[in-house]
Regions:
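Conserved amphipathic alpha-helical "coupling/scaffold" segments
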Residues: 1-216
């Protein structure tokens, strides 16, 4: 993307991050995002404006679109996913014997690390299903920016281990075995970590567009 060159004086003149008279600065008008990462993306949009007219038009179309969906997960769930993916404890490849051997120990002894892993895996699985459904059901007349996001989701999922996760968890209510949780955990926090970060960026893009739509 091509960005417009700006400096501190430009930010001050536009009252993007502060004002001299304690007036409401521009970012405060748009900081009503529902997620922390959405807020960071909104600030990035304001601090680094685009100069490419085509990219600007894409953003404008997305912001004024009346069919912007509700966020696919709530703030607490998204925060937990971010925490889980950044969690570096006990990242190891799944082994069925080890998974079976630790079943009883996990039943009788509370393990905070195991809680993070189990809940994190279930939330990521839910995220994958939500994103696939959103991308699949996106209206044909949706803005180009939304279409590009849906295409990115499809490209990441198609033929990948993440698509296999979707197939294996078609019934989200079905309880996952310890071995499956261990297998998915290694996939999410190691093998396909960057892919999941890209998928999460779609949620934050929706958050920014929804917020700008409300304020505008």
């Amino acid at each position: 993307m091509v960005y417009l060159a700006t400096d501190k004086q430009t930010y001050a003149d536009l009252s993007i991050t502060e004002t001299a008279n304690n007036e409401q600065f521009l970012f405060s008008l748009f900081s009503k995002t529902e997620t922390k990462e959405g807020k960071a993306l909104m600030l990035n949009w304001l601090m680094y404006p685009l100069s490419d007219l085509e990219e600007i038009r894409k953003r404008q179309e997305a912001i004024v679109w009346d069919a912007l969906p509700e966020l696919l997960l709530n703030e607490e769930e998204l925060d937990f996913i971010e925490y889980y993916l950044a969690y570096r404890d006990q990242i190891r490849e799944a082994h069925i014997l080890l998974s079976c051997a630790t079943v009883i120990d996990r039943l009788v002894r509370y393990d905070s690390t195991r809680y993070v892993i189990c809940r994190g895996v279930k939330l990521v699985v839910h995220l994958l299903h939500c994103l696939k459904e959103w991308a699949t059901e996106l209206p044909q007349g949706a803005p180009q920016l939304m279409k590009e996001s849906a295409a990115m989701i499809g490209n990441i999922l198609h033929g990948s281990e993440l698509e296999e996760v979707l197939e294996q968890t078609s019934d989200e209510e079905k309880r996952l075995s310890n071995f499956v949780i261990d297998k998915f955990d290694y996939l999410f926090r190691c093998t396909r970590l960057l892919s999941l970060k890209e998928l999460l960026s779609v949620i934050y893009l929706l958050d920014v567009c929804r917020t700008a739509h409300r304020v505008a």
